[in-house]
Amino acid sequence: MTRNFRERKMPGVEIARIAELLDPIVVAERQLEQISVYLDLLLKWNARMNLTAVRDPEQIVLRHFGESLFAARELFPDPDATGSLVDVGSGAGFPGVPIAIERPGLSVTLIEAHGKKATFLKEVVRSTRLTNASVQAIRAEEYVGVADVVTMRAVEEFASILPVSARLVRPGGRLACLLGSPQAAEAEGVIGECWRTERTVYFPGSTQRVLWIGQRAQK
């Protein structure tokens, strides 16, 4: 008899433990299974290429998955939300892949110029059966199209991302960045007339990490 997937062990973290670590974010069983498969792949690939500096599996769940799922719910409170999202410089897939898992009604495009990382992302999409996500192995400047929301993390110079973001986000759409609090403070001084800060929210349990959400001007 097949055991409930919550009881099965994965090479990284048991599925039931993933659910505990993500608490108070409650994740459906199907999504937990996808997260577990994703985490397993990330740990295997990270052993031979630099996808994330965080090596401890539980810390990956707490920080990377926790922050990404929090962002999903802040950006799209409705579980049945639809629309388009582009994740720029997706790298290991955060926050784009967890958002696609958490909000299956969205159309999510993962942009990653680094060939090996793009290959990893394609394997994640295939293995987790993410029918609402696709990968483009290009630079953000080469992407054709606009989205309702653009997401980014590991932003080094906030001012440098704004011109590219303005081209990718539809008028009235949003840019969401996972930042350190000093970078969020920097954002206020450089966003210019094209953007306005919608809100800045600290991630649960953190005084250093924030989700900055800006809205593009209508014109």
Curated annotation (Swiss-Prot):
One of its GO terms (molecular function) is rRNA (guanine-N7-)-methyltransferase activity. GO terms for cellular component: cytosol. It is found in: Cytoplasm. S-adenosyl-L-methionine binds at G89, F94, A140, E141, R153. It holds the Pfam family GidB. Gene3D superfamilies: Vaccinia Virus protein VP39. It comes from the Bacteria. Signal peptide: none annotated. InterPro entries: rRNA_ssu_MeTfrase_G (IPR003682), SAM-dependent_MTases_sf (IPR029063). Keywords: Cytoplasm, Methyltransferase, rRNA processing, S-adenosyl-L-methionine, Transferase. Its EC number is 2.1.1.-. Coiled coil: none annotated. Specifically methylates the N7 position of a guanine in 16S rRNA. Belongs to the methyltransferase superfamily. RNA methyltransferase RsmG family. This is Ribosomal RNA small subunit methyltransferase G. It comes from Koribacter versatilis (strain Ellin345). The gene is rsmG.
